[in-house]
Amino acid sequence: MRALKESEADGLFINPVIGEKKTGDFSTEIILESYKILIANKIYPDKSVLLGGFNTYSRYSGPREAIFTAICRKNLGCSHFIIGRDHTGVQDFYKENENKEFFNKLNNLEIELIFFNKIGFNSKQKKFANYSNSKSFKEISGSDVRASFKTNKKLPNWYMRKEIQNMIRLKINQKKKVFIQ
């Protein structure tokens, strides 16, 4: 939401990768259903969001893949592209700011890039924030999310909205495919 506000864009195109995934990833169905719930619950500005899957797969090639996906999104008509701290990297294989350094070496790709470093939750300020060593900073971990579902442990609402958790737990109870095996 911060990126949408800062970019002054007219809307948000949510374009998750829906192709082949690795073991342990959430299934495409769970990812798309989660976004549909967020849209239905008006988490995003009303009538300003489009959801469409990007039928490719992660190559785990860090900065090179960030360039590829940015160009693909530009070709889909996007004016901005968000790049996270470790965009399709493999744990700590790439340096923390390697994406940004790599993009700075290139000429204009004709798409505005929005870079994010490590994000977490500041429990004192009750909002998401860039990484800090503060005791009030709570890290977000995909591994912790997966583990919580395997042990049936509820996550705080700031970590994952309860509507999403409820949907995933229901799918697990229905023996639906939640994680790639």
Place the predicted regions along the sequence by residue.
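Active-site cores that bind ATP or allylic diphosphates and position pyrophosphate for catalysis
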Residues: 1-181
